[in-house]
Amino acid sequence: MIGILGGMGTQAGLDFCNKLAVLNRGKIDQEYPLFLLYNKSNIPGRPESIGSQTKNLSNKSTNKNSKIKYERVLRSLLKGCKLLEKNKCRFIVIPCNTAHYWYDDLQKKINIPIINMPKEVFKFTKKNCKKNSKVGLLATEGTLKTGVYNNFFDEEYNLLKPSDDRPQCGFVRAPDQPR
């Protein structure tokens, strides 16, 4: 069974479930994939829990306040992952890019794999795009702040994303807007 930790953008979790069903369409109900969606919408805000001085995963807790916020989100995400693990899920998917900022710490604390979404996007890109290609990243401010995609793309691709010297207005807010 697939475990889906949603609620960090409830629509994102539901959209993932819909795509999972459409892409794995069975002829009868019993041929659809088994999955358990935990819509854990009470996880503290991820963007607010990333230290303002934090630039990458190796510098997660730059000050006491950032560390407290980081740990609060980690505990909440971990509770969700543990519930999915307890319910016999074989692996976990988290359809929230920003939540992957906590990926390494989460994976260390549970016994089933968590699919690393930025890593999977990188593998897809590597398979379909030439090395050193320009690749655009449409993402929320929280995802951009975490740098979770930089960790994979920086050495092999020219990752194009909004920066402080370019206006971000509608471009960055778009992924957060209701459809």
Question: What do these predicted ranges mean?
Answer:
Residues M1-R179:
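Non-catalytic structural scaffold of enzyme domains
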